[in-house]
Amino acid sequence: MQKTEEIEVDINLNADLGESFGAWRMGDDRALLAVIGSANVACGFHAGDPLVMTETVRLAGEAGVSLGAHPAFPDLQGFGRREMQLSPRELSTVVTYQVGALMGIAQSQGQRVTHVKPHGAMSNMACQDAAMAATIAVAVKAIDAQLILLAPALSELAAAGR
């Protein structure tokens, strides 16, 4: 009988969090934080607000979960799922604004944003549009070259992030 080798595998479960805003509660962030390794925090344009972002950062820190920004098109009513045609300057600024907001909140709590994962229509469009993907990747790198850009494999966004 052959002896099989044990292989240790690390799996990082990732989830979108902080999608409540105002009086509206969305999802069970506390339950998810118990099982995930990294969180994509809504940055206010598709969901979330400054208070929710602050609380989500606090809870993630307590759970030892790494933080990621989850920027979206300015589409609160459509939950960031409606396509928008933004100029490269507008797109870059929208991404920078949202990532910067989360970075400031995280820093105020002694934490660090480790990654960026575009949300909804922004992500879907950038996965197919090389110019849009490049705009997002350049914006993320300009903010902090150490940030990881999360993207689906074989997408234009993944290629731009390299």
What are these regions (language model features)?
Residues 11-17, 39-41, 67-71, 114-118, ...:
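Hydrophobic faces of well-ordered beta-strands that scaffold small-molecule active sites
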Residues 17, 59-84:
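Glycine-rich nucleotide/cofactor/substrate-binding loop typically near the N-terminus or early
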Residues 21-54:
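A short alpha/beta connector and helix-capping loop motif
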Residues 29, 39-46, 77-92, 126-130, ...:
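Glycine-rich tight-turn/loop motif centered on a GG-T
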Residues 75-77, 107, 112-114, 124-139:
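N-terminal active-site wall of soluble small-molecule enzyme domains
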Residues 106, 129-162:
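Glycine-rich, Lys/Arg-enriched anion-binding loops that position phosphate/diphosphate groups
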